[in-house]
Each structure stands twice: as C-alpha cells, then as structure tokens.
C-alpha cells in the first residue's frame, strides 16, 4: 500500500540511517499497511451496520439505535462485545472440525478481496493484473465455508441453507464475470482495478462505465446483491423456511463472524461497483467541479496528502451511496422463491451478460 512514494523513500532513508536492513523496513511497511487496512475495514463495517439500522428504522417509522453513543453510533460495537461474552455451543452429534472451521472459511476470503481494492492511485496493497478476477475467484470460496458449516451442524435446516448458498453462488458468479470481461474488453484491456479506474478518468464524468455499459451495470448490480445473499436473495438463511439457515446451530463469536462476513461482502461489492462503474477515486462531476472551493483544492494538487484524502472520501461516498440502494432494496422488496432465484440467474442474467459481451466485442471489432 503506497500512500506516498516519496514518503516511503524518506522512511527507507531514515531506517538506513539507523543501520536497519531494507528487508526489515519492507516487513514493517507491509505489516503497517495491513493494520491500517484492517482498521479502515472495521470502521467501514461499523458505519455500514449503523446506517442499515437507521435506514430500516426510518422506513418502518421507528427511531432505531439511540442510546449507545451519539445517535446510537456504537450500537454495533456493543452487539459485537455481547456476542464475545456468549457461550460457544457445539452440536453434540455434529462434525466439530467442519463446524469450527466453517465461519473462518467464510470470513477470510472476504477480507482477502480488499487487497485489490484501490482507494487512490497508490493506495492499494496488491495491484494485480487480474485484480477483479481475483475478487471473483476468492469470493467463490465463501459458499464452501457455508456448506461446511451447514453439514457440520448435523441439522437439516443448516444443510439446506448451505446447499442453497452453493447453488446461488454458482448461478450468479458467471454473469458477474461476464460483466467484468465486457469492461476489460471495451476500455482498459486489463483486469487491474487501477487500470480500469484510470481508463474511465480519460473521458471524465461521461466516461464512467455506468454510461458506457448500462446493461452490464444492471446485471452486475443484481448479481452482486445475490452474491451478498441479501433480500430479496437471502434464500440460504430464510427465517420463515429454514429458521436461520446455515447459522441455526451457531452462537457467540462464530455467529458474529457470519454477521461480519455479510457486511464485509456488502461493503466490498459496493467498493467494486465504485471502481468498475463509477470512476473510482476521480471526481468528475462537471457542475460541482466549477465551484471555487474545489478549484482551489485541485489547484493545490502538489500536496499529495490532500489528494489522497480527497480520493478516499470520494470512493467512500460513492460506495455508501450504492450501499444505501442495497439497504433500501432489502427493506422494500419481498423475498423471491428458490426457483425464481435460479431462473433469474440462468434464464435472465446469463443471456443478458452474454449478449452484452457479444455487443461489446462487435463494437470493438467495428472500430478496428
């Protein structure tokens, strides 16, 4: 994670003056970057949980969290602390190894997906050439953890929830990948998240992929909601049918890990929508760029710290706007049936994503 190349060189010089090896500095720098990323993700998830509670309360004409901190902002922290104090119950006739390892298999891949998310041109832990496909590939491990959790619980509801999660993931990963291929084919010829953002920046606000790939954006939006397993696509944990799905036998910190993974996945999906379709950290809205204050800020671009802070704020604003849409969708639409879920993925989204890819390829061939 290169916050500032010049800053990194200055720190290397400082460590060299202390007679410390460059390898030791690189280790410290990587550890520090990972720590900052984990802290940022944690704060982002806490804010997202608070936003969902407040938005859902507003929709249902309630007050929502109010007493745990100002406006109830630390309510999620209080809930997490409560889960830490609860007893960890393990089913007597279940597979203990699968039951214990399942939550970790669910959370770890979601954390790893943040490695390829850029918050600025140099603010990324791993700028891979296959960055977006890395996210899709690593996300496909999550249903395995859900299946392990369901099978290890020795509970029919848990097992059915795990099977539903696997079927849902397979159904919607293919349209997701095809939408990403369309973006790579049309603009950047690269799957690097940084390259995709920079390719959009060349054409300003109207160069965002949401305008160039409207069909792909719609398919990606629906598929990402299904991958997050949120209403109307929360079939793996449907309360009316499966009690709590794969979470039925879990309690304490392990139940909390599933809860955290759900919001981590939503935040990651929102960030990827921002990177792939909304121009990333670039602020390209014309009528706002004409304001005197923003003119002054961008004219002082020599200060890289200001640019970094502005880029992070822009990415977060765009991401939370998408999260707001996802939250509104959850609290306003009813749950679909399992057959409707699979039909939507295989009979609607997959042909649309394939047609969008074919249309993009034909357009590129015509330009050549």
UniProtKB/Swiss-Prot annotation:
GO terms for molecular function: oxidoreductase activity, acting on NAD(P)H, quinone or similar compound as acceptor; quinone binding. It comes from the Eukaryota. The keyword rRNA-binding does not apply. The keyword Plastid applies. It is a multi-pass membrane protein. PANTHER family: NADH DEHYDROGENASE SUBUNIT 1, NADH-UBIQUINONE OXIDOREDUCTASE CHAIN 1. HAMAP family: NDH1_NuoH. NDH is composed of at least 16 different subunits, 5 of which are encoded in the nucleus. This is NAD(P)H-quinone oxidoreductase subunit 1, chloroplastic. It comes from Physcomitrium patens. The lineage of its organism: Eukaryota, Viridiplantae, Streptophyta, Embryophyta, Bryophyta. The gene is ndhA.
């Amino acid at each position: 994670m290169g916050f500032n190349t010049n800053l990194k060189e200055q720190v290397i010089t400082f460590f060299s003056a202390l007679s410390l090896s460059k390898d030791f500095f690189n280790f410290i720098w990587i550890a520090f970057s990972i720590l900052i990323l984990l802290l940022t993700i944690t704060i982002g998830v806490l804010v997202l949980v608070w936003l969902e509670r407040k938005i859902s309360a507003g929709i249902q004409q309630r007050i929502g969290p109010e007493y745990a901190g100002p406006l109830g902002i630390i309510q999620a922290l209080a809930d997490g602390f409560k889960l830490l104090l609860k007893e960890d119950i393990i089913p007597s006739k279940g597979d203990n190894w699968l039951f214990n390892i399942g939550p970790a298999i669910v959370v770890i891949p979601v954390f790893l997906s943040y490695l390829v998310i850029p918050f600025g041109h140099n603010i990324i832990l791993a700028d891979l050439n296959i960055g977006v496909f890395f996210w899709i590939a690593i996300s496909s491990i999550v249903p395995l953890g859900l299946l392990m959790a369901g099978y290890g619980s020795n509970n029919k509801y848990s097992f059915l929830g795990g099977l539903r999660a696997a079927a849902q993931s397979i159904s919607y990963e293919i349209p997701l990948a095809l939408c990403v291929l369309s973006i790579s084919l049309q603009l950047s010829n690269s799957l690097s998240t940084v390259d995709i953002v920079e390719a959009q920046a060349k054409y300003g606000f109207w160069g965002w992929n949401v305008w160039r790939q409207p069909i792909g954006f719609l398919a990606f939006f629906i598929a990402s909601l299904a991958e997050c397993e949120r209403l109307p696509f929360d079939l793996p944990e449907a309360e009316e049918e499966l009690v709590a799905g794969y979470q039925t036998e879990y309690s304490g910190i392990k139940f909390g890990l599933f809860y955290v993974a759900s919001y981590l996945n939503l935040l990651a999906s929102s960030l990827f929508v921002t990177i792939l379709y909304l121009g990333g950290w670039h602020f390209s809205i014309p009528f706002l760029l004409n304001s005197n204050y923003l003119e002054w800020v961008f004219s002082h671009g020599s200060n890289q710290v200001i640019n970094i802070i502005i880029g992070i704020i822009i990415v977060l604003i765009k991401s939370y706007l998408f999260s707001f849409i996802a939250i509104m969708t959850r609290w306003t639409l009813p749950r679909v049936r399992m057959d409707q879920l699979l039909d939507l993925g295989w009979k609607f989204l997959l042909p649309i994503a394939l047609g969008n890819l074919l249309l993009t390829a034909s357009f590129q061939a015509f330009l050549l």
